[in-house]
Structure formats: structure tokens, C-alpha cells
Amino acid sequence: MNRFLFLMYFFCGAMIATEVTQYKAKYQFDSEEISISGIREFKKKNDGYELKFRASNIVASMFFISEFDIDEVGVRSNSYEIKIRPKFLKRDQLIEFDRQENIIKSSGRNTWKSSFISDEIAVDPLNAQIMIRKFIKENVNQFSLNLINMQEGGIETYNYSVSNNIKCDFNNEKYKCVVLDRTQPGSTRKTTYYLAEELDYMFLKIIDESEEWTNKLELKEILSFG
């Protein structure tokens, strides 16, 4: 999988139904190849929800947006779009969910079409973490999510497990953090999430590790909350 594809799994977050907290926050992303900060914003629209992230520096610009509905079961994805423009990579991709035909379609750099079960929750890299926060809020310590395969289409299952409860530092204050690990059968990649209880389980830090790299996303400033 392309290394920049991993960025899409970082820039996300929210709640569920009436517990959804709208917010705007600044995050810092660091890897061996790039360091960039940007604004992530979650808000309710007249016809659903929107979660987006926008960042830029002298070598790259990034834009991610997920549009979706939330019902009593969870997230219902509508569309997901990415635009990444480092000097050494141009990547545009649009994912559309057709729930009448039960088809997921991708256009842009990766073009494919996949079918899915009508009542199946298939999440994109952004709204996946809405489901994560839902489960953590409900004190579920182990669960799985079906994420779309951005390159080839279809659904991939990822497993999540709470591994610890610790104190985290943010803005000169201590927060109760749930430490959550994400793994996939047959892969050495591991993603660790640090979710702050006092901030409705907002993501304070995410560390993505494999044998080849370590990527890190960290909350720097909350611009608005609630």
C-alpha cells in the first residue's frame, strides 16, 4: 500500500447520533518523509454530516472529506474524497456509496467497482473513527470494522482491542486516555490510538507502525468544541 494512503486513516474523529460533538482542531503529522500541520473539522449539515481535513506546506497539500449519515446502528457512508499534491505525488480519488444498488464506486487514480450487503456498515478512512469512538464510549473493549480497500476495492476487516488506560498530557493538563490497538490478520502493521475521556474520546495521538516506517499524528490545539 502506498505510504500516503496511510494518511487517510489519521485525519478523522467524531461521536454518534445525539452524542456527536462538533469541533475544529489543529493536528500535526510527522513521518520520515514529511512534517505537516492542518485543520480538521467535523460538523453537521442539513442533509447529514461532514468531516474534513486540510493541510499544506511548501512541499505538499492535502485535502480529505467524508460525507455520511448517522443512524441508530452507526455510520452510513455517502462519499469520500482525497486530494494529495506533494511535489513527488499527485493523487485524487473519489469514493461513492450507492446504497440503492449496493455498489461502491471509485474514480480517479484508482478506478474500481465493488458490491456490498445493504445492511453492512462499510466505513471509509475518516468516518471509521466515528465507529471507534462509539464503541469506546459504550465501553466495548474488542470489536472489528469493515474498511474499504482504497486501492483495489472490496472490504477489509480490521480488529481493535483496548490495551491500556493511562494518563496523557495535552495543553499542560492530564487526561484519562484509553489506549486502543488496531491490527489485521497477516499484517505486521499496528496502529495505536490514544483517546481522551474528558474530551468525549477525541484522539490526542495516533501512532502507525510497520517494519518500514513510523507515522505519528498529534493534537496540537482545539479551536472549537461543542
Model-assigned labels for residue ranges:
Residues 4-14:
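Sec-dependent N-terminal signal peptides
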Residues 90-136:
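Hydrophobic, well-structured mid-protein blocks that either form specific transmembrane helices
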Residues 18-99, 140-226:
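Acidic, serine/threonine-rich low-complexity disordered tracts
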Residues 14-15, 40, 110:
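Compositionally biased, intrinsically disordered low-complexity regions
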